[in-house]
Amino acid sequence: GSEMCIRDRLKIAVAGTGYVGLSIAILLAQHHQVIAVDVIPEKVDLINQRKSPIQDDYIEKYLAEKELNLIATLDATKAYSEVDFVVIAAPTNYDPLKNYFDTSHVEEVIKLVRNVNPNAVMVIKSTIPVGYTESVRQKLDTENVIFSPEFLRESKALYDNLYPSRIIVGRPEGDARLEEAAHIFAELLQE
């Protein structure tokens, strides 16, 4: 039978608490246990006090009013070691002069997850160049990476996650486990 069942409560870590990460963390924390990971102590403290570190009406409202199974932490290693999914929403800075995406933050997360929890399925939500998921799988020697692009407007990020126009999850051909993980993740986003 299937190891992961959508009816089970899953444990999910979210790397990065910008618009993308925080809105996903809040969305998922309505039904699952979510650990939001950031490197900035002030942001972690605010989230744990149920205050939003960013300006977004829905995020502020949900943090204040909803019952969320959400904690924020600076301890990435511990967070990643005990979860089923790691949603990667780390910043990727685009350099227009070099026509280059700096994906180093994303890769740091992938390396750490691979080392502390090789079975966790990683879902990249960060903005990344075309073909990146495949190349990073080879470069970092891990299969467990899927990509789910975002269609969010700043300051409407949580709203757009609550009422998505579409949900896309990309994964490699012929890998049954990732195929299932992709379907589960898509369902999580629609609960």
Description of each model-found segment:
Residues 12-14, 122, 167:
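Conserved hydrophobic helix-helix packing surfaces used for dimerization/oligomerization
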Residues 54-55:
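N-terminal FAD cofactor-binding segment of flavoenzymes
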Residues 59-84:
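A structured beta-alpha segment of the ubiquitous adenosine-cofactor-binding alpha/beta core
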Residues 88-91, 126, 171-172:
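Glycine-rich, N-terminal phosphate-binding loop of Rossmann-like dinucleotide-binding domains
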Residues 94-157:
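Rossmann-like NAD(P)(H) cofactor-binding subdomain of soluble oxidoreductases
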